[in-house]
Amino acid sequence: MEKIFKILANLKFAIALLLLISITITFGSIIEQDQTLDYYKQNYPLTNPIGGFLTWKVINMFQLNHIYKNFWFISLLLSLGISLIACTFFQQFPGIKFSRRCYFSNNPRKTDFQTQLKTNLSRNIIYTIISEGYFVFQQKKNFYGTKGIIGRIAPVFVHLSIILILLGSIFASLGGFNSQELIGKGEIFHIQNVTSSGPLTKLSQQAIRVNDFWINYYPNNKIKQFYSNLSIINGDGQEVRSKTISVNKPLIYKDLTFYQTDWNLLGLRISHNNKNFQIPVIQTTQNLNKVWLTWLPLESNTSKNLSGETIIINNYKGTIYIYDNNGQLNKKIELSNFIENKNYKLIEFLSVTGIQIKSDPGILFIYFGFGFLMVSTILSYLSFSQVWLGIDYLEQNNIKLTVNAKTNRTKVLALTVRIQPFL
């Protein structure tokens, strides 16, 4: 078992895993994820495969249509995590343990700086070493100093950070979900239209109410921003949280995040003879802008002289344009105004707001992992330096001082500059 862990702790093995994961993520970025089989058959046909090999059968066989949730990708992440753990225990911890020891030696090997001198200023040299931040230990006539032990400990936290990121990714793949909802103003809804989910996903039964929806426009009638006011409702029907969301300003409640994504018109509410009714609209586009069309009957369907008017809506400002049967603009009507002979009154635009709901149980692991990774990576670049001093007493009160120094980051020690005047 120990041999297996030593293989897992091998740097080449970890690099190979990272390469495989990188290639897999590249495929996940190129191939659209979580689409229907018909979509892949249409875009990745058997004839003329992309790159000479990529067809819908290959995608389906290797589960490339949901890479981040399939078993072999999660196995790669787990293998990398185990490799990092093995490397930490078999390589990092022994190195830290060795660095904490007082390693006294008269002639250490592979040093970056070495000199011998006859001097009576050994005490001054030792004080200089201490002033440089070294911890100095003495054993008879030998001195040993270390500095920057945090630089040897930091790689352990780098590994821990990456493991946290891997765990967060696995939790997100197994337990996260994504939902798209189109909800009318004033309605209460639950999460239903799930577009993607993991095998261990548990859908929240949280109730949400859309209190209001509105749009801000630029002077040229281009949409500036659209907003939805949402309320979180508890089991007793009480509001526990409320926030107005917009694009890039979501509502976060527990493990749910609500994003503003889209909007649409469903119809118009009209009043006729003190009775309200609704007429649906049909969406189309004009110059890449949304336009809605509908037809308002002005007589009953049983009338022989059935007539009506065409209504066009091109924004959410509360304005409609009425055209006659010849396609000529008849009038422009605002909300709460009468459409025809004070018999038909425009009451309300019936709109829906598009809400994307995400749950990611691994997001905190990923955030903390990246935070630790940034800090520990910076700390890992701190040099771990060692210095050895050996004192030999000569005749006539002279002292022979042997100085050796070593560092793991740079070949030029700042300490050598400080002790240069004594050499």
Curated annotation (Swiss-Prot):
UniProt topology in membrane: Multi-pass membrane protein
Protein localization: Plastid, Chloroplast thylakoid membrane
GO CC terms of this entry: chloroplast thylakoid membrane
Keyword Cytoplasm among record annotations: no
GO biological process: cytochrome complex assembly
Chief place where the protein resides: plastid
Record InterPro entries: Cyt_c_bgen_Ccs1/CcsB/ResB, ResB-like_domain
Lipid biosynthesis as UniProt keyword: no
Region forming the signal peptide: none
Superkingdom: Eukaryota
Record field: transmembrane: 11-31, 70-90, 153-173
Disulfide bonds: none
Keyword list, A-Z: Chloroplast, Cytochrome c-type biogenesis, Membrane, Plastid, Thylakoid, Transmembrane, Transmembrane helix
Oligomer status and interactors: May interact with CcsA.
The family this protein is said to belong to: Belongs to the Ccs1/CcsB family.
Function: Required during biogenesis of c-type cytochromes (cytochrome c6 and cytochrome f) at the step of heme attachment.
Protein name per UniProt: Cytochrome c biogenesis protein Ccs1
